[in-house]
Amino acid sequence: MLDIQTHMDFAGQGKAERWSRFIITFFGIVGLVYGAFVQQFSQTVYILGAGFVLSSLITIPPWPLYRRNALKWQKPIDTDAKSSSSESGDEGKKKKKQ
């Protein structure tokens, strides 16, 4: 099967958000200026929509540039050792008086 990576690290998420904001803002300004120049609000909406589509294609998929800072995970805790130590620890505790 295909080995498709689906994660994005925290730095990549921030980068994707900045790119998304920049692209949509840029296309919004260009669309507003062009729409005012040709006196067609529909052109503004079309240009903004194109910016949204471009922004989505650039920022939503987890491209490799958004996965450069891999997270360092801790080693898993052995659940058998943890459960046996918590059971023995409960025996030594006193119950509250009511």
UniProtKB/Swiss-Prot annotation:
Membrane topology value: Multi-pass membrane protein
Membrane topology (Lumenal): 39-42
GO cellular component: signal peptidase complex
Keywords: Endoplasmic reticulum, Membrane, Phosphoprotein, Transmembrane, Transmembrane helix
InterPro entries in UniProt: Spc1/SPCS1
Domain of life: Eukaryota
Intracellular or extracellular location(s): Endoplasmic reticulum membrane
Cytoplasmic topological segments: 1-18, 66-98
One GO process term, biological-process aspect: protein targeting to ER
Recorded family membership: Belongs to the SPCS1 family.
Function noted in UniProt: Component of the signal peptidase complex (SPC) which catalyzes the cleavage of N-terminal signal sequences from nascent proteins as they are translocated into the lumen of the endoplasmic reticulum. Dispensable for SPC enzymatic activity.
Subunit structure: Component of the signal peptidase complex (SPC) composed of a catalytic subunit twr/SEC11 and three accessory subunits Spase12/SPCS1, Spase25/SPCS2 and Spase22-23/SPCS3. The complex induces a local thinning of the ER membrane which is used to measure the length of the signal peptide (SP) h-region of protein substrates. This ensures the selectivity of the complex towards h-regions shorter than 18-20 amino acids.
PANTHER family for the chain: MICROSOMAL SIGNAL PEPTIDASE 12 KDA SUBUNIT (PTHR13202), SIGNAL PEPTIDASE COMPLEX SUBUNIT 1 (PTHR13202:SF0)
Protein name, entry field: Signal peptidase complex subunit 1
Annotated organism of origin: Drosophila melanogaster
Organismal lineage: Eukaryota, Metazoa, Ecdysozoa, Arthropoda, Hexapoda
